[in-house]
Amino acid sequence: MKTRFLEQIEEHTGIINKIVNLYADNTDDRQDLRQEILLQAWRSYASFENRSKFSTWLYRVCLNTALVFHRKSKRMVTVDIDNIKPLSNNNEVHHGAELLYLAVKQLPPAERSIIILHLDGYANEEIAEIIGISKNNAAVKLHRIKQTLTDKVRNEANRV
């Protein structure tokens, strides 16, 4: 069981990295959150029944752990633009993508979860299952989040 768990975690480490980087703003918090996610995943692995894909289950564990971590820290998500890591070291990264990344980082944690899943290609039905809401609620929330992001990116682009 341990070997299979470690293999699946290794295969889906990108999910963990993505959640950690979007929910923790400094190195210490990233390490703490990564450790907490791995611990929670291991603790609940025995209850994983293969009714969904492992990646779907892992997303749910990661997001739930990140939300609890965020609540425990009782910090508001603030973004210091000078400390934001660019999406790439490549100077050709499109400015709009950077603005979107910054806007996503500024969303409340629950909304951030929904848009991350959407950007990763999950359907509304899968998002609803992972987050624990109805499919219609997921669609409505996603529409509102997209509008919020569009407004934030547009406002920031106009400021520059």
Question: Each predicted region: which residue ranges?
Answer:
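A short, charge-rich alpha-helical start-of-domain segment used by transcription regulators
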Residues: 1-18, 31
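Pre-recognition alpha-helix immediately N-terminal to the DNA-recognition helix
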Residues: 15, 99-102, 110-113
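Structural recognition of an alpha-helix C-terminal capping motif at a helix-to-coil junction
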Residues: 18, 32-39, 43, 52-64
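Hydrophobic positions on the alpha-helical face of helix-turn-helix-like DNA-binding modules
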Residues: 37, 61, 114-115, 127-128, ...
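Arg/Lys-rich amphipathic alpha helix in sigma70-family domain 2
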Residues: 47-49, 60-79, 93
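Acidic, proline/glycine-rich intrinsically disordered inter-domain spacer in sigma factors
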Residues: 76, 82-105
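Short amphipathic alpha helix immediately N-terminal
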Residues: 107-126, 130
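DNA-recognition helix of helix-turn-helix
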Residues: 131-155
